[in-house]
């Protein structure tokens, strides 16, 4: 088995954005108050209208992914323990969402921050929908998948983003590019790997000690972890 070519996943735009998740991204601890809820509801309408979710994926074996430099670090290897292959996934909301976030923030910082939080929540919804499609595919093959594991988790470096994008041909197939600083554009995009196994497998949950966000993580400031929500 080699890498590629990637294949598209059909994603339906959800009827609404998960406002509870958006409130958490917004920094509303313990849930949104009335003013925050109203702001999120107001900003959600144009944000959702601007979204054009797209996703691509492929299946590859460990040797091919290792040769391509994608399986860098120890934690992603632990995540794939017991797996015979892996799926690469990329999901993006499209450039319209980035543009809407910028528009919302002109003269209204709070609306810009709220729109950014809504974009993050919607990107996660799109990734969850894509993962659900892949789980259905795996079930038809009699296979099982781990959870999603993204660059920046544990010691899996953001430096693999260009490699994932190249393997998935995201620029051509989804309009998703990676900058010289390993940042994705459009910004509201997610890449991930999922292990494929012949038996149920959970994958590896990285500890906070290796996470690239450990010094500025809002969850850690509250004495909890992202795995608890």
Annotate the PLM regions:
Residues 35-38, 42, 121, 125, ...:
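Conserved active-site and cofactor/substrate-binding residues in soluble primary-metabolism enzymes
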Residues 1-112:
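Active-site helix-to-loop segments that bind/position phosphate- or nucleotide-bearing substrates
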Residues 224-229:
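Short cysteine/histidine-rich metal-coordination sites, predominantly Zn2+-binding motifs
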Residues 83-147:
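Conserved mixed alpha/beta catalytic, RNA-binding, or beta-rich assembly cores of soluble enzyme
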Residues 45-52, 135, 139, 169, ...:
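Generic secondary-structure signature for well-ordered alpha-helical cores
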Residues 34, 74-78, 210, 215-216, ...:
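Metal/cofactor-centered catalytic core regions of large enzymes
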Residues 141-219:
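Short terminal or interdomain "cap/linker" segment that borders an active site or interface and mediates
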